[in-house]
Design a protein with these regions (language model features):
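Acidic, glycine-enriched loop/beta-strand segments at the rims
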Residues: 2, 15-28, 41-42, 296, ...
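Divalent-metal coordination cores built from histidine and acidic residues
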Residues: 56-61, 72, 76-192, 196-257
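His/Asp/Glu-enriched, well-ordered alpha-helical/loop segment
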Residues: 264-349
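Extracellular/periplasmic ectodomains of large secreted or surface enzymes and adhesion receptors
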Residues: 1-8, 12, 372-384
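Histidine/acidic-residue-rich catalytic or RNA/ligand-binding cores of hydrolases
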Residues: 190-198, 211-214, 250-260, 270, ...
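Divalent metal-coordination and catalytic microenvironments
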Residues: 13, 29, 34, 58, ...
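A short acidic/small-residue loop/turn micro-motif
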Residues: 42-47, 69, 380-381
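Mature N-terminal segment immediately following signal peptide/propeptide cleavage
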Residues: 3-38, 55-68, 72
């Protein structure tokens, strides 16, 4: 382990910047004080005298991964780091998450950088603990003000909201220039959510009802869809500027309790829809729903990337959804790239992830907020 703000020099690495698909071979990357200080051909300049040198011959330096949909638990923090994830977006805020975030930021606890939305704003009956019920649209203003007071920068909208409550939450959010994201409530069409300016849609929620031939199947409406509806929905999504975090891998697990043919259709049709999002240029984020029972925190991100490639994305575009594009969504300049001035959230790999997405699993080490953890140091981190 080498702790920030010390200088660290990675020598003779192949750099995957994520700015484009091109790689830079035989580079020296110097990080200091949590930032990337320089990227130069190895040997072109003397190394900083105070730098710890990490030899990277035959290795690839890429941005650390960003899991854009987690439900954060303290016990899981090491699992994210072991998987090369240095940043997470927590998708249900509550006091325990606020405490974890504070402890990580103060240095009291080691974990990924945490971005979080508010408590879920939902109607009755609530599905999860720490729900803020908004059964009366007139209560939306108060509910949103409570979330602001609690320090949450964005709102989470959820499944059981009435159309009226959803619209009232949207209006309260817009008065504050505040993002809202999450599910498309059952009472709201996906087109209405897009027109309302929902910033991200999780799990392709709402699209299922718009494309299915079998209403009333909930999330598993994907078993029987009309693909001729995909194109226009995606066009409208791009027009609205809404991002999608499709959480593909968890549906591979959740669909196991369906018939074999329905399961195969659910997986295939979700892949087809994601392929259309990518083909038209809609914005995609890689997220796992980690913290939900069927998903393993950390390792599930590699499953998610594999699923995005199975949907037809190139390894580069799949990886962008977990690096550069995620950083753009989070509005952190440079995050998810290997560029000068960017946050030093980097992963050293024993293979090129643009050649095969499976290489994201071959982790030789990770920098988190500018501190370096070798594979051995990561392996030694406590796990549940």
């Amino acid at each position: 382990v080498v702790h920030a703000p010390a200088a660290i020099a990675f020598t003779n690495v192949r750099v995957v910047s994520m700015i484009s698909e091109s790689r830079l071979d035989d580079q020296t990357v110097v990080i200091r004080d949590g930032r990337i200080e320089s990227i130069e051909p190895s040997g072109s300049n003397p190394l900083p005298v105070d730098a710890t040198v990490i030899g990277g011959r035959g290795r690839v330096l890429a941005p650390a991964l960003i899991d854009m949909h987690v439900h954060l638990l303290r016990a899981d923090l090491p699992l994210y780091l072991k998987a090369g994830i240095a940043t997470v977006r927590n998708m249900w805020g509550h006091s325990a998450v606020a405490a974890i975030k504070r402890d990580i930021e103060s240095g009291a606890t080691l974990g990924p950088t945490v971005h979080s939305v508010s408590n879920g704003l939902d109607g009755s009956p609530p599905r999860w603990p720490a729900t803020r019920l908004v059964n009366d649209p007139r209560d939306a203003e108060t509910a949103v003000q409570e979330m602001v007071a609690a320090g949450w920068p964005a709102l989470k909208v959820y499944q059981q909201l009435s159309a009226e409550s959803y619209d009232s939450i949207v209006a309260a959010a817009k008065r504050r220039n505040m993002d809202f994201m999450g599910h498309v409530p059952t009472a709201v069409t996906v087109l209405h959510a897009l027109e309302s300016g929902q910033r991200s849609i999780e799990h392709l929620s709402g699209y299922d009802r718009a494309v299915t031939r079998r209403q009333g199947m909930g999330t598993f409406a994907w078993a029987d869809v009309d693909p001729s509806r995909f194109g226009e929905l995606v066009r409208r999504t791009i027009e609205a500027g809404t991002w999608n975090c499709p959480t593909m891998a968890i549906f591979v697990e959740l669909s196991r309790n369906h018939t074999a043919s329905d399961r195969a259709s659910i997986i295939a049709n979700r892949r087809l829809f994601v392929a259309e999002l990518q083909r038209q240029g809609a914005r995609l984020l890689a997220g796992t729903d980690a913290g939900i029972d069927v998903v393993s925190p950390g390792s599930s991100m590699h499953d998610e990337l594999r699923e995005l490639v199975a949907a037809g994305l190139t390894p580069y575009h799949a990886l962008r959804a977990a690096t550069k594009d995620a950083g753009e969504f989070l509005r952190v300049p440079g995050l998810g790239t290997v560029t000068v001035g960017a946050p030093a959230e980097l992963v050293l790999l024993d293979g090129d992830p643009l050649a095969s997405i499976e290489n994201t699993r071959r982790i030789a080490g990770l920098t988190v907020r500018g501190s370096w953890y070798s594979a051995a140091a990561l392996a030694a981190l406590g796990s549940r």
